[in-house]
Amino acid sequence: MQTIINKLYEQQGLTQAESQQLFDQIIRGEMDPVLMAAVLTALKIKGETPDEIAGAAKALLANANPFPRPDYDFADIVGTGGDGSNTINISTTAAFVAAACGVKVAKHGNRGVSSKSGSSDLLSSFGINLAMSAQDSRQALDDLGVAFLFAPQYHGGVRHAMPVRQTMKTRTIFNILGPLINPARPNIELMGVYSKDLVRPIAQTMLQMGLKRAAVVHGSGLDEVAIHGETQVAEIRQGELIEYTLTPEDFGVSRYPLDAIRGGEPEENRAIITQILTGNGTAAQMAAVAVNVALLLRLFGQEDLKANTQQAIAVMKSGQAYGLVQQLAQRG
């Protein structure tokens, strides 16, 4: 272990196996907090590589509580948070809309990072049980096409790093690990990142983790596909990394200012999301959700973004997506 730590002090990159070994020790609570702070700082200053991120993610997944993984294709749609924009919960809303469009989504989330209301804050306000067992969540995924996995329930070991992270008061590798450690291990993922510099490295990390098809996006300051500007995309398709830029016009929607999709406290967000999921949101709110659903549907093989956007809007207007929220809440 000392050899691994010395490599970091010398600003050398770790192999995936070394990173996995290092984070295994952190997650098991076997590393002194002072040393942990030094390690996280050294990684941050050096800049985390895809090997290091993949190794850390594998360590967290290996130590996570198990989830009965389905053998069908299913996805996660998630952002790192931390983009400081306080927008409405786009990825959480998109998960229900995508499920209503006929694909399966197992969303892994936590309490708010950059918005006042993270995915789990919002779901709680709808009466959805965050403490649902793994078996019940799997059943919901089978029956409804959507399930929510609350991170602390599966990743107890992360608590060992919490005091250090809170004291450091800066972003560390843990801020980007959340979306990579879904315990259901989806084979498709749409992930938003808070910085355009992360788009390629995170996509390379996903390639190493064996995802079938995935896209990493940064939308003009947002950890989502943007409707106020361009979105940088790195997509994994058949083991290849393809990079491109998308504009709102590619989805057939107008451009809207960022202010048009600001969120609020969980209760305010609940009202906004209810409006969107019943087809009564503003044009900007509906478009913001629809473009993210559209790119997710592309990852399931529906290549036409404009048609996908229209499908998502039609599903919102039909009320089907809101019906799934209610059905998930009824499962207690």
Curated annotation (Swiss-Prot):
Question: Which pathway does the protein contribute to?
Answer: Amino-acid biosynthesis; L-tryptophan biosynthesis; L-tryptophan from chorismate: step 2/5
Task: Give a Gene Ontology cellular component term annotated to this protein.
Answer: cytosol
What does the record's cofactor remark say about binding?
A: Binds 2 magnesium ions per monomer.
Keywords for this protein: Amino-acid biosynthesis, Aromatic amino acid biosynthesis, Glycosyltransferase, Magnesium, Metal-binding, Transferase, Tryptophan biosynthesis
> Which residues make up the binding site for anthranilate 2?
165
Cofactor(s) demanded: Mg(2+)
List residues binding Mg(2+) 1: 91, 224
Q: Where does Mg(2+) 2 bind?
A: 223-224
Q: Where does 5-phospho-alpha-D-ribose 1-diphosphate bind?
A: 79, 82-83, 87, 89-92, 107-115, 119
Q: What class of enzyme is it?
A: transferase
Reaction(s) the record says it catalyses: N-(5-phospho-beta-D-ribosyl)anthranilate + diphosphate = 5-phospho-alpha-D-ribose 1-diphosphate + anthranilate
Q: Which molecular-function annotation in GO is an example for this chain?
A: magnesium ion binding
Under the heading InterPro entries, the entry gives: Anthranilate_Pribosyl_Tfrase (IPR005940), Glycosyl_Trfase_fam3 (IPR000312), Glycosyl_Trfase_fam3_N_dom (IPR017459), Glycosyl_Trfase_fam3_N_dom_sf (IPR036320), Nuc_phospho_transferase (IPR035902)
User: GO:BP terms for this protein?
Assistant: L-tryptophan biosynthetic process
List its EC numbers. Answer: 2.4.2.18
Q: Which Pfam families match?
A: Glycos_trans_3N, Glycos_transf_3
**Which residues are involved in binding anthranilate 1?**
79, 110
The record's function comment reads:
Catalyzes the transfer of the phosphoribosyl group of 5-phosphorylribose-1-pyrophosphate (PRPP) to anthranilate to yield N-(5'-phosphoribosyl)-anthranilate (PRA).
Give the family this protein belongs to, as stated in its UniProt record. Answer: Belongs to the anthranilate phosphoribosyltransferase family.
Task: Give the PANTHER family listed for this entry.
Answer: ANTHRANILATE PHOSPHORIBOSYLTRANSFERASE (PTHR43285:SF2)
| NCBIfam families registered for this protein in UniProt | trpD
Assembly, in brief, is:
Homodimer.
Record protein name field: Anthranilate phosphoribosyltransferase
Give the originating organism: Vibrio cholerae serotype O1 (strain ATCC 39315 / El Tor Inaba N16961)
Q: What is the lineage of its organism?
A: Bacteria, Pseudomonadati, Pseudomonadota, Gammaproteobacteria, Vibrionales
